[in-house]
Amino acid sequence: MMVFTSIYSVVDGFFVSNFTGKTQFAAVNLIMPFLLLLGVVGFMFGTGGNAIIAKTQGEGKTERANQIFTMLVTLTAIVGFILFVAGELTMPWIVKTLGATEEMYDYAVLYGRIICISVMPFTLQILFQSFLPTAGKPHVGLTITVIAGVTNIILDFLFVGIFKWGIVGAAAATVTGECIGGLAPVFYFLSKNSSTLKFCKFKFDFKVIGKACVNGSSELMTNVSTSIVNMMYNGQLMKFYGEDGVAAYGTIMYFNFVFVAAFIGYSIGSAPIVGYNYGSENHKELQNIFKKSIGIIFVFSVAITLASVLLAGAVAKIYVGYDEGLFNLTVKAFRLFSTSYLIIGFNIYGSAFFTALNNGLISAVISFLRTLLFQIVCVYALPLIFGNGAIWLSITVAELLTLAVTLSMIFTQNGKYHLSLIHISEPTR
C-alpha cells in the first residue's frame, strides 16, 4: 500500500516536469517536504496506536480494541482538519522561508494551497494503512490504494497532459486520489463488514492517546525529520547548484519515495503480527518473524540498489531529459545516492520493530539519529570536507552510523525480546 501511495508524487513529478518545465518542477519539489510534514500525524497515530490495538487483540480484549481504534480515527480526522487550516494560512510565509526564487514563488504557493485541501484525507489514508492489516483486511487497503493511485494517474494525464492545466491540474489530481484513499476506508468501516475492528461508541482516553504518541514517536520523528532534512538539502542545493540542484534532488526523491515506501510498507504490515505475538508471549515465533524479515529486507536492499544504479540514466531521461546539464547532474547524483538503499531498510525495520514491541523510546532514538541528527551533520559537514558533490553521499554515511546504533540496540535487548540473529543456547543446569 505504501508503494502505491507514493505513486501520487511520482506521477505528479513526471507530468509537471515534462509539461510545465523545470521552474515549476523545482517549485513543487521545494514545497513538497512541508506538504508531507502535514500528514505525519497519521504515521504517529497509525503505528503507535496499531501497536496498542494489536497487543489488546492478542490479550483477547476485542471491544477495548474497537474503542481505541474508533478514538484514534476520530482524533486523526480532527487534527488533520486543524493542519489543513494552518497550512492554508501559512503557505506564503512557508514558501518564502524555504528560499523560493521570484520565479518559483507563485507556483509553490498555488500548488501548496491546493494540496492542503486533502490534508485530512491524507492523514486518514496513512492511518488506515496501519489499521487495515490489523483488522484482517490488508487486501481492502491495497485495493483502495490502487484505485486511488490509478485515479491520480488518469487525472494527471487529463488535467496536465491534455487540458494543459499545469501544476493546478497536477495538484487537483493528487487531491482527488488522496480523498479516495482516505475516505473510502471510513465508508468501509461504516458499512457492514467482516473485519476484526469495528467502529463503536468511545470516550477519549488520554492515557491511551499518550501511549500511542510515545509508541509512534519514532515514526513521527522519522517523517518530521525527513521533511526538515529535505528542506535543508534544498537549501544547500540551491546554494551549490541553483534551481537545477533542487530539480535533480526532486527527481531522486520521487523514486526514493517508492523504494523507501517498500521498506516502510513491509515494516508497518508486519507490525500487527509482531505486536500480537508479543502480547501473547510467543517468543519463539517473534524471533522467527524477526529473522525472516531481515532476510527479506536484505534481498529487497540489494535488488533496489542494483536497479537504481543501472536505471539512473533512464529515470533521469524520463523526468529531465529535455535539459542536458540537469540530466547529467541527476544521473551522477542518483547513482551516489542509491548506495544508501543497501542500509536504509534495516534501520527502518529496526525502528518499526521496537515500536511494535511497545518500546517507543528505543524506536524514537533510532529514528531521531537516523533521520535528523546524523543527516543534518552529514549534509553540512561532508560538502565542507570533500566538496559540493559529497552532499549526495550524506544519506549513505548517516545510514551507516544509524546501522551501528540499531545493531547495538538489537543485541543489548536480545535477552528481553529474543531478537538476535545469533542463537544463544540456554545454559545447562
Question: Residues of each region from the PLM?
Answer:
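Residue-level hotspots within pore-lining transmembrane alpha-helices
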Residues: F4, Y8, L38-G42, I82, ...
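Transmembrane alpha-helix boundary and packing residues in multipass membrane permease domains
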Residues: M2, F14, A51, P92-W93, ...
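Short alpha-helical transmembrane segments in multi-pass integral membrane proteins
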Residues: I53-S118, I162-S217, V274-S340, A381-S425, ...
